[in-house]
């Protein structure tokens, strides 16, 4: 590799934004993106919604057309797993093939789904990659019974999509309320009520004890820790993710940077911002002002937008009804430090601007 070359390990959003920003800011050295999946960078959020519903195809998920990568001299090395990083020799070592040398390295390796310590038969899925979504989509047939283990946003989106496709859906959550760790019990229970009103069987304070298989080895039921049994033709396990940190150096290395879910909160907007920040660090450019945390989710007729960083212990001020509401998380001085907004896009945009100019980001 020529001098000043940048290798980016991870072909997700953070890796793609790093490469794009390097070129946009005038970097003319070699850029290589190495991705473990055999596909170019794509929009992961659509996997649980439009792609699963069949309203978007794989080509429409691409972050950029193939001509973009070629036209900007960004090399994509896909279907390649990096096994080792040598920060001293400045090389990355793929499972097969020759090492790649780098002047600067960006680790954007993302996150992987947390696995349950159970033996899981056929018909049990996770959803992180395009391949996962392909496999799950083939099994979402009308009239079938889907059990979603985990009441997070992705699980709720899959439940919403499957319900619209005509499946019978149950959501199993071990906590007292879904997304309680982020939004608190009060708001989480509001969402659970919304799911129930739409016909979802919601089981709270119940974990997965066992997945039962039929004679063919395929799932036919799940047994919960509260003793109940749910029929299941398909199961989605969505109990969170964990960062893929195996390649991170044990000690800080001046030429090694990290971006995206491997170091961040695991959300689309944060990953994009991280990629931009990594590129600017490499180029020695000043950091951009911090942005308010932002997450969105489309489920059961609601566009949910989380602005800022809510704390479950914060007092919550509610306004609106089941179809359009704002839950404001208040600081000690009574000001809004974060909010969950449902079908309130203009207010969400205004709050993002408001928090951008407040002291909340400094205190978060």
Task: Give residue ranges: language-model regions.
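FAD-binding core/adjacent interface of flavoenzyme oxidoreductases
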Residues: 1-7, 62-147, 205, 223-239, ...
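Mid-to-C-terminal Rossmann-like scaffold of FAD/NAD(P)H-dependent oxidoreductases
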Residues: 2-5, 262-346
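Beta1-alpha1 glycine-rich phosphate/pyrophosphate-binding loop at the start
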Residues: 2-74, 161-182
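Glycine-rich Rossmann-fold phosphate-binding loop(s) that bind the pyrophosphate
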Residues: 10-14, 36, 128, 149-154
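Glycine/Thr-rich phosphate-binding loops of Rossmann-like dinucleotide-binding domains
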Residues: 41, 115-116, 156-157, 180, ...
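Rossmann-like dinucleotide-binding cores of NAD(P)H-dependent redox enzymes
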Residues: 145, 153-210, 291-296
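Short FAD-binding loop at a beta-strand-to-alpha-helix junction that anchors the flavin cofactor
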Residues: 250-266
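A short, polar/charged loop-to-alpha-helix boundary motif
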Residues: 345-360
């Amino acid at each position: 590799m020529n001098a000043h070359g940048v290798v980016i390990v991870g072909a997700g959003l953070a890796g793609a934004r790093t490469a794009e920003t390097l070129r946009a800011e005038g970097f003319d050295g070699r850029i290589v993106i190495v991705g473990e999946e055999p596909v170019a960078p794509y929009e992961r959020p659509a996997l649980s919604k439009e792609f699963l519903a069949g309203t978007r195809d794989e080509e429409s998920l691409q972050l950029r057309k193939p001509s973009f990568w070629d036209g900007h001299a960004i090399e994509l090395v896909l279907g390649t797993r990096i096994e080792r990083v040598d920060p001293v020799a400045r090389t990355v070592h793929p499972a097969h093939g020759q090492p790649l040398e780098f002047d600067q390295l960006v680790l954007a390796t993302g996150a992987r789904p947390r696995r349950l310590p159970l033996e899981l038969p056929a018909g049990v899925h996770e959803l992180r990659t395009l391949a996962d979504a392909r496999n799950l989509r083939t099994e979402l047939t009308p009239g079938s019974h889907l059990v979603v283990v985990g009441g997070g946003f992705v699980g709720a989106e899959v439940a919403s999509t499957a319900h619209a496709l005509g499946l019978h859906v149950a959501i199993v959550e071990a906590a007292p309320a879904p997304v309680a760790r982020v939004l608190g019990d009060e708001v989480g229970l509001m969402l659970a009520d919304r799911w129930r009103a739409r016909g979802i069987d919601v089981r709270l304070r119940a974990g997965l004890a066992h997945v039962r298989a039929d004679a063919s080895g395929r799932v036919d039921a799940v047994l919960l820790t509260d003793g109940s049994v749910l029929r299941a033709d398909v199961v989605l396990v969505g109990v969170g993710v964990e960062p893929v940190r195996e390649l991170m150096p044990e000690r800080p290395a001046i030429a090694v940077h990290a971006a995206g879910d491997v170091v961040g909160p695991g959300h689309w907007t944060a990953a994009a911002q991280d990629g931009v920040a990594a590129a600017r660090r490499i180029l020695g450019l000043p950091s951009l002002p911090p942005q308010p945390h932002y997450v969105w989710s489309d489920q059961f007729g609601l566009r949910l937008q989380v602005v800022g960083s809510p704390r479950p212990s914060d007092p919550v001020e509610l306004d609106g009804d089941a179809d359009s509401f704002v839950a404001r998380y208040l600081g000690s001085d009574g000001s809004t430090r974060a909010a969950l907004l449902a079908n309130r896009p203009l207010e969400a945009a205004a709050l993002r601007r408001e928090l951008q100019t407040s002291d909340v980001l400094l205190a978060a």
